[in-house]
Amino acid sequence: MEKIIDEKKQGNSLVLEPKAKNTRKLFIESYGCAMNFSDSEIVASILSKEGFNTTQNLEEADLVLVNTCSIREKAEQTVRKRLEKYNAVKRINPGMKVGVLGCMAERLKDKFLEEEKIVDLVVGPDAYKDLPNLINEVEEGRDAINVILSKEETYGDISPVRLQSNGVSAFVSITRGCDNMCTFCVVPFTRGRERSRDPQSIVEEVNDLAAKGYKEITLLGQNVDSYLWYGGGLKKDFKNATEIQKATATNFAALLKLVAEAQPKMRIRFSTSNPQDMTLDVIEAMAAYRNICNYIHLPVQSGSDRILKKMNRLHTREEYFTLIDNIKKMIPNCGISHDLITGFPTETEEDHQDTLSLMEYVKYDFGYMFTYSERPGTTAERKLEDDIPEETKKRRLQEIVDLQQKHSKQNTNSVIGTTVEVLIEKESKKSNKHWSGRNERNTVTVFSKENYQIGDFVKVKIHDCTSATLIGEPIGLSDNN
């Protein structure tokens, strides 16, 4: 499971600057993880060259696309409700075409197209370059489908448009797919095997973003720490590479250094990490470069060795602690967040207490916490009974949330009286007299506007906080501007 985009952004229709020559309208919504939002930018770029401008008005759209997530049942239910809405509009505007992209496309292709007949086209995560052909098929009166998973596709040759961007922060995709086969997760089945993007194309995209005024990028993948470029191909086939390919391969630590050195004033973040794949050289790279942010999203899923084994997580509780110890030793001011699942099949109270004690050991800045949601097609769904009562799941989740809020408040309290560097991203939601941005540790920070602008790096003296937000006063521009 991976970090989910802020709930307030889920389902936002995305829009980019129109091209005068384009005559057709595209309405595109995204749900789920950051990778889906990044993929929607790739789709919009491809379709912009096919005559489509984006619109936020569903009723005027010629083509409606929803980029979908299968991580949790709730996400699929939300998309189904949106498909009902699209089809209600389509009854008024029969010329409108509706398509499903992403993880649900691969999993539910037959149901959507043949049984329920609620969409015109179904396109999997590796087939977006085929969209122009598929749209032509639909316009000629045929259903269209391509959910073939690729061994090579990384979209490294596509320059993504930046949909609804603040002009400050951008995602840069570096890997696709996942090889880890966690028993609860659909990603390996919907996004395929791991493959990495050419580092040169990544650096070129970062340089292009810097030239356009962007101040921060997030290197993105289902498992960024397993990034490995040896000339192309699947990660699992690296063992068959030539000696020269092995000797000249680029791993994630090396990629971090390349990007950090290419743009020394640009903030570098990355997500998501897998504990079993994060190596000391990644932590060393973070410590060595000021512009690599002191923040790691490090999903653990459970604090119980027994449950970790059933999840096919290839690390133990103690190995996770060792990694945490190394991070805190080498990067003392590093923010750490997590994903946790409670109520996994067979989870006992002792297992649950192990999770709480792990949280006490780490004291995360924040986390993404869920009750277990059985996903069709996963190993857990096929081999393990979902045997934990919902009320037990909810009670355990609340205990996890309560403990996380306690730790979050302790962490933000510890920053009071210090000065942090904040990149201004937007106006505060609660006051038009304040800016909102994030510090290096990824903590939201608000402060009075004064004469600063979006995109400025500002030194802020912290005087108050909530469990999720730092509150301070600006004391001047940082030397990173």
From Swiss-Prot:
Protein name listed in UniProt: tRNA-2-methylthio-N(6)-dimethylallyladenosine synthase
Domain MTTase N-terminal: 24-140
InterPro entries named in the record: Elp3/MiaA/NifB-like_rSAM (IPR006638), Methylthiotransferase (IPR005839), Methylthiotransferase_CS (IPR020612), Methylthiotransferase_N (IPR013848), Methylthiotransferase_N_sf (IPR038135), MiaB_methiolase (IPR006463), NA-bd_OB-fold (IPR012340), rSAM (IPR007197)
EC annotation from Swiss-Prot or TrEMBL: 2.8.4.3
Residue ranges constituting the Radical SAM core domain according to the UniProt record: 164-410
Any one of the GO CC terms: cytosol
Function description: Catalyzes the methylthiolation of N6-(dimethylallyl)adenosine (i(6)A), leading to the formation of 2-methylthio-N6-(dimethylallyl)adenosine (ms(2)i(6)A) at position 37 in tRNAs that read codons beginning with uridine.
Binding site for [4Fe-4S] cluster 2: C178, C182, C185
Binding positions for [4Fe-4S] cluster 1 per the UniProt entry: C33, C69, C103
Cofactor(s) the protein needs: [4Fe-4S] cluster
